[in-house]
Amino acid sequence: MTQFTHINASGEANMVDVSAKAETVREARAEAFVHMAPETLQLIVSGQHHKGDVFATARIAGIQAAKKTWDLIPLCHPLLLSKVEVQLEAIEAENKVRIESVCKLAGKTGVEMEALTAASVAALTIYDMCKAVQKDMVIGQVRLLEKTGGKSGHFKAE
């Protein structure tokens, strides 16, 4: 079994030393979903939501969150991201919004947490903007879709 990289021999949490690692191009994609009532989704899609453009706000929130992941999650390295992209798609037949994020850099550690944070915070932003209309929305299915680069190589979710 693979050992946890953030735990030392004494069981204490520590930030991993990546100084000796080779710099490689790394990319990660993640997704999240927000399930809601058809009426709530229609407010978003039609642009009639009283708080403004929900997708634009969620996109910016996701991008900002990726850049601040190191500040939110203990032991994450501050990274010089070269790309953060957040796409939002209304899936009206299923009454949900799909969020997909992509983070990329040339560096010594991966960007999986940044991609997951971007998708998660974009979903939270949708909830925040729509909670006055509907409080029982469900955020879920947050997952890593794919990652490339680094020692562990390529991963793609099934």
Curated annotation (Swiss-Prot):
Keyword hit for Lyase: yes
Domain of life of the source: Bacteria
GO function terms (MF aspect): cyclic pyranopterin monophosphate synthase activity; GTP 3',8'-cyclase activity
PANTHER family (alphabetical): MOLYBDENUM COFACTOR BIOSYNTHESIS PROTEIN 1 (PTHR22960:SF0), MOLYBDOPTERIN COFACTOR SYNTHESIS PROTEIN A (PTHR22960)
Residue sites binding substrate per the record: 75-77, 113-114
Gene3D superfamilies assigned: Molybdopterin cofactor biosynthesis C (MoaC) domain
Subunit structure: Homohexamer; trimer of dimers.
Annotated catalysed reactions: (8S)-3',8-cyclo-7,8-dihydroguanosine 5'-triphosphate = cyclic pyranopterin phosphate + diphosphate
Keyword Lyase: yes
Keywords: Lyase, Molybdenum cofactor biosynthesis
InterPro entries from the UniProt entry: MoaC, MoaC_bact/euk, MoaC_sf, MoCo_biosynth_MoaA/MoaC, Mopterin_CF_biosynth-C_dom
Extent of the signal sequence: none
Protein name stated in the entry: Cyclic pyranopterin monophosphate synthase
Classification via HAMAP family: MoaC_B
Family classification: Belongs to the MoaC family.
Pathway the protein acts in: Cofactor biosynthesis; molybdopterin biosynthesis
E.C. number(s) listed in UniProt: 4.6.1.17
